[in-house]
């Protein structure tokens, strides 16, 4: 459950780091939210408020946040999981049909942290 939350955090900041929230990205996050019970939805809403604060502090803060999250996961998930999550994050990035510089940078950071090749 904690792993899912961390992945939600990463997906959320990636989808918002271009500071243009496309309707496709919104749909995607609402699909994720639909999987959760009402109690968990409340928790996720609080998390998004926290994540919005991180985003408001600028891309350097977001970068540090993603580095610390990906570091904490490094030894907890195997390579197959890393690849699956990177694919998921890539999907989130591609939803608005364009790759913003910030999205590319965060994706590359994740790839580097997890010893994977970036294909964006």
What residue ranges belong to the model's regions?
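Small-residue-enriched hydrophobic alpha-helices in membranes
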Residues: 1-120
């Amino acid at each position: 459950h904690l792993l899912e939350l961390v992945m939600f955090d990463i997906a959320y900041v990636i989808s918002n780091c271009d500071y243009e929230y496309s309707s496709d990205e919104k749909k995607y996050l609402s699909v994720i939210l639909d999987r959760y019970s009402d109690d968990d939805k409340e928790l996720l809403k609080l998390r998004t408020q926290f994540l919005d604060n991180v985003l408001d502090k600028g891309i350097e803060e977001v970068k540090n946040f993603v580095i610390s999250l990906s570091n904490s996961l490094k030894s907890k998930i195997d390579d197959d999981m890393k690849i699956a999550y990177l694919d998921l994050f890539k999907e989130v990035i591609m939803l608005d049909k364009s790759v913003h510089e910030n999205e590319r940078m965060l994706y590359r950071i994740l790839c580097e942290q997890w010893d994977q090749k970036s294909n964006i």
